[in-house]
Amino acid sequence: MTVAPRIGTATRTTSESDITVEINLDGTGKVDIDTGLPFFDHMLTAFGVHGSFDLKVHAKGDIEIDAHHTVEDTAIVLGQALLDAIGDKKGIRRFASCQLPMDEALVESVVDISGRPYFVISGEPDHMITSVIGGHYATVINEHFFETLALNSRITLHVICHYGRDPHHITEAEYKAVARALRGAVEMDPRQTGIPSTKGAL
């Protein structure tokens, strides 16, 4: 039996941004990313490729003021599209984790497609609060991005930076680790025929 690909879409238009996202959880890593923020585009591309998600993100925001609105609003819409794509959660693995290195940095991500949104981040070095990549991406936004993603997709997400020095490496490892963990958690489990919960609902 052929199963239809799980595709989710979402849009958001405010006075600060106009964002459209489409994600195919059963894709092959094809990406179409344009946010007007080159480093953020790079991170979302890595997210799609390493999650094996077909991912389209088109965003127009007030980047002449700051990247913050565009990054955080993109996380809202991406989370909503993920929730749409995941659907009723029947047959998914639900839990997954990934430890991912990038040179000197090591990041771990743990995901539960729980229906109970929760987010924890720990271990980032203090200079992540003040670092700026490419002149436009303040790494303090990492926490906001992943928290907003977790809340809007209604997942439990833990991100742990075990160690690292370069803000670029830490940030990229975080995006890739979250993508890999999500890929594992939304994967269909041939031994799971129903909702993966003793309660019968997620």
UniProtKB/Swiss-Prot annotation:
SUPFAM superfamilies: Ribosomal protein S5 domain 2-like. One of its GO terms (biological process) is L-histidine biosynthetic process. PANTHER family: IMIDAZOLEGLYCEROL-PHOSPHATE DEHYDRATASE (PTHR23133:SF2), IMIDAZOLEGLYCEROL-PHOSPHATE DEHYDRATASE HIS7 (PTHR23133). It holds the Pfam family IGPD. Its main location: cytoplasm. Gene3D superfamilies: Imidazole glycerol phosphate dehydratase, domain 1. One of its GO terms (molecular function) is imidazoleglycerol-phosphate dehydratase activity. InterPro entries: IGPD_sf, ImidazoleglycerolP_deHydtase, ImidazoleglycerP_deHydtase_CS, Ribosomal_Su5_D2-typ_SF. GO terms for cellular component: cytoplasm. It is found in: Cytoplasm. Keywords: Amino-acid biosynthesis, Cytoplasm, Histidine biosynthesis, Lyase. This is Imidazoleglycerol-phosphate dehydratase. CDD domains: IGPD (cd07914). Belongs to the imidazoleglycerol-phosphate dehydratase family. Pathway: Amino-acid biosynthesis; L-histidine biosynthesis; L-histidine from 5-phospho-alpha-D-ribose 1-diphosphate: step 6/9. It catalyses: D-erythro-1-(imidazol-4-yl)glycerol 3-phosphate = 3-(imidazol-4-yl)-2-oxopropyl phosphate + H2O. Its EC number is 4.2.1.19.
